[in-house]
Amino acid sequence: MKTRMGRVRPSVAVALAFACGACAFKPSGYGALAQAERAAAQAAAEKESAPDTPGMYLALIDRMQRQGLYYASLAHIDAYEKQYGVTPDSTFLRAQALRDTAQARASAEAYRALLATPLAAQGYHGLGLLAGAAGDFRGACRALERAAALAPTDAATLSDLGYARLREGDVAGARVPLMQAAELDPKSARVQANVVLLLLAQGRAKQARTLMDERQFTPAVRAAVRDDAGRVAQAARAFKIGTGSAHDGFDARTSSEGNDQ
């Protein structure tokens, strides 16, 4: 819904552009594929020296993170900021690395620091991923909705929002963002995994199996999707009961007001 709330974990690491700027970096998301999409850490750290321009250095740090070298990337972020100063891009990369090294509180602080910058969408996205990782899918939905409002065509954000809504039990609310994500980025394995999860939640098991066959999902990914489908089904039952109770309460108040008259 890898959404990182998105490297979300199927979540799933998305190839990032090396150019610096407001749209240079994106959090990876979560969902049925997040773990499967993480690149394995390199056997040996890269030996190339630090680039001599800010853009090249940020590109190197980003590449290290995509290779799973999160601790090393934190050291290089420190070096970058010592040489060039703190920037929104370096803060975003720090937030990502902190999240991927199980430093959730520090990661959240870094993501929040982005909210008043051109990378506010990435900040909300990251906060949503952290909330989802902590099991707070209602909070994840709120943060991801803000992210999607700021970046309405970002497929990863929409996919993570749809996944978070599924985990919150709001199957109907998950449909539109997931369909948007599927059309915006039809080749994304993470998006397709979350669409399969939606189909299962809608009771369309045959279509879900067909899509998994077409996309050649591995047995491990299919098992992850099935596990998530069970959680979504349980959440959907609770969501239905909760919304039904809310409607009953409204009707009761309306009836009471009518009787008073």
What are these regions (language model features)?
Residues Q83, A116-T117, L150, E183-L184, ...:
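Structural marker of alpha-solenoid helical repeat scaffolds
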